[in-house]
């Protein structure tokens, strides 16, 4: 039997499994005006309470393809404190996970006056999740598979983080899944270390009457696997109708700093007649959004761009948002995450 290409998908498999057991996978939804999804220190940091509903679907042409839905809400408790909640529903084939995260943030202000943004924030988030393996449709040909049941396990973990917003500059750092967590639902030898370090930084500049630009970077490091991933982002904002509406868009490029080797050739049983190549995970995500009064809608589409990939279809994501209990924009800065 001839095979045009034989692929070893180690990198992509590692990428998917690296996210599979976390309460909330790290995708590009934070770019839809929702840094709170990643950083509990951003709870209540803005002048409005923010409700965000996100649905992400991968590979529409595949049965039981990965899908994720989140509902998040965060807002101010008082001038120096904020709180939030995130609801999560994540599915991938016969595996699913539901969870809730509760957050509290404290904000320290170093403003010279009421219009200069200089704020340091600290946040804590507690998370509860239930993982499920649905074996009700499994055939009992393997004694190690129970079949006919749903296996369930509950997990608890915490995130801690800090944010610094200074005029048009921002910096966020969070340690996710700080505690060791046993995951005996799958095997007795699953790693208990789910710790992930996330760093975001960016800067906005431009003219509010014309265009405002926001370049940013996100860096991730996974403690257990030592894998590192970086996002390079660029967003642009344009106000319409005297500020009643704002259209914005941009692009994100994600790249793994770690690679994997694969064999490309005409035979599975022999390495002869082929070559060993390597590649790194990378995909591009364009994003388009619209704010009208207190409403927000955004759409993102992620497309893998490396040679080896599971499927040619991309990942679609839609976010709906509503800003509540808004106060007048306080700070003189191009800071859409705060003003």
Residue spans of the language-model regions?
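Positively charged n-region of N-terminal signal peptides that target proteins for export
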Residues: 1-6, 112
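Sec/Tat signal peptide C-region and signal peptidase I cleavage site
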Residues: 16-20
């Amino acid at each position: 039997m001839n095979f045009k290409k034989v692929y070893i998908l180690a990198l992509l498999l590692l990428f998917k499994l690296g996210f599979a057991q976390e309460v909330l996978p790290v995708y590009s939804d934070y770019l839809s005006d929702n840094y709170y999804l990643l950083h509990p220190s951003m709870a209540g940091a803005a002048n409005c309470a923010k409700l965000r509903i996100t649905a992400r679907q991968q590979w529409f042409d595949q049965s039981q393809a990965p899908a994720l839905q989140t509902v998040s809400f965060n807002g101010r408790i008082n001038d120096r404190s904020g709180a939030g909640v995130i609801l999560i529903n994540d599915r991938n084939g016969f595996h699913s996970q539901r969870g809730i995260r509760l957050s509290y943030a404290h904000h320290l202000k170093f403003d010279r006056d009421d219009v200069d943004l200089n704020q340091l924030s600290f946040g804590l988030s507690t998370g509860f999740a239930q993982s499920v393996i649905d074996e009700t449709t499994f055939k009992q040909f393997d004694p190690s598979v129970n079949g006919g049941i749903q296996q369930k396990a509950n997990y608890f973990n915490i995130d801690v983080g800090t944010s610094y917003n200074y005029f048009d500059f921002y910096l966020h750092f969070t340690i996710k899944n700080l505690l060791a967590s046993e995951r005996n639902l799958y095997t007795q030898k699953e790693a208990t270390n789910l710790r992930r370090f996330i760093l975001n930084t960016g800067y906005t500049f431009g003219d509010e009457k014309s265009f405002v630009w926001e370049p940013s970077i996100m860096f991730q490091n996974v403690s257990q696997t030592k894998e590192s991933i970086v996002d390079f982002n660029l967003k642009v904002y344009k106000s319409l109708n005297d500020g009643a509406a704002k259209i914005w868009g941009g692009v994100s490029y994600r790249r793994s700093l770690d690679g994997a080797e694969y064999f490309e050739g005409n035979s599975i049983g022999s390495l002869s007649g082929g070559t060993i190549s390597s590649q790194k995970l990378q995909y591009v995500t364009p994003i388009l959004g619209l704010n009208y009064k207190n409403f927000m809608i955004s759409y993102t589409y992620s497309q893998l761009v490396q040679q080896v990939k599971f499927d040619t279809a991309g990942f679609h994501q839609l976010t709906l948002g509503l800003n509540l209990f808004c106060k007048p924009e306080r700070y003189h800065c191009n800071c859409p995450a705060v003003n």
